[in-house]
């Protein structure tokens, strides 16, 4: 089922949406670069902080899932990551006039994209770039 009620579709859609955002930015001539540490400090909204915190929790979660023989923890993490990304995307504009904020948000999107791709790969699920 292709709806937000299907957790696999929901996670794949988050990945595809990020890929679409990055393509759109590149098509509009935005030069994507790694932001400085000072620029990354601009990621201060509740949605950004929540997303960053969730990204940082992955390593510990993988260890816990392995130690407890509970791969469902990874599945749950992927769903939460998709939800947190969609919440961020609905609350914050990635493309802004403030170059530093924009580059930091692009970097955050890339971190989510890479993490989602890796988590889906652990679950043997494809991460499509478009849907």
Question: Each predicted region: which residue ranges?
Answer:
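Non-catalytic interaction-recognition regions
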Residues: 1-131
